[in-house]
Swiss-Prot record:
One of its GO terms (biological process) is translation. This is Large ribosomal subunit protein uL22c. PANTHER family: CHLOROPLAST 50S RIBOSOMAL PROTEIN L22-RELATED (PTHR13501), LARGE RIBOSOMAL SUBUNIT PROTEIN UL22M (PTHR13501:SF10). It is found in: Plastid, Chloroplast. GO terms for molecular function: rRNA binding; structural constituent of ribosome. It comes from the Eukaryota. It comes from Brachypodium distachyon. The gene is rpl22.
């Protein structure tokens, strides 16, 4: 009899390409001012990470005006807090750094897990049922781009 050794299959994970390659397709890197950046983070948003990620994937690497239009027309509940966050980041960039809103470009839009709020729901016969409400942190980074006229 031949015995076979069972080996756990480990798939190879491809490294993600850097975001600058994606950015280079939309905006030439010579026009992107790397150090002219504004960050805005919102913490403990009562929303699943996956629901927020679906919206953030649509707005990443887009201009501010285009992003606002997309978020206004999206049918998802997750788009409203993200819209407020993008508005706030653009207002901060315009007020504190004197950036023009027409030249703002979203270079970073990421979501991370936050704490899970645990509650208990009373059930029949004196039992209780756990309810887990997930929360997330969302970070937006806006760069200024020199547009060619």
């Amino acid at each position: 009899m031949t015995s076979f050794k069972l080996v756990k299959y480990i798939p190879r994970i491809k490294k993600k390409k850097s975001g600058l390659r994606k950015l280079a397709r939309k905006v030439p890197t010579d026009r992107l001012l790397k150090f002219e950046r504004v960050f805005k983070a919102q913490k403990r948003i009562h929303m699943s990470v996956f629901k927020a990620q679906r919206v953030l994937d649509e707005i990443r690497w887009r201009y501010y005006e285009e992003t606002v239009m997309i978020l206004n027309l999206m049918p998802y509940r997750a788009s409203y807090p993200i819209l407020k966050l993008v508005y706030s980041a653009a207002a901060n960039a315009a007020h504190y750094r004197d950036f023009d809103k027409a030249n703002l470009f979203i270079t970073k839009a990421e979501v991370s897990r936050s704490t899970i709020m645990k509650k208990f729901r009373p059930r029949a016969r004196g039992r209780s049922f756990p309810i887990k409400k997930s929360m997330c942190h969302i970070t937006i980074a806006l760069n200024i781009v020199k547009r060619s006229k």
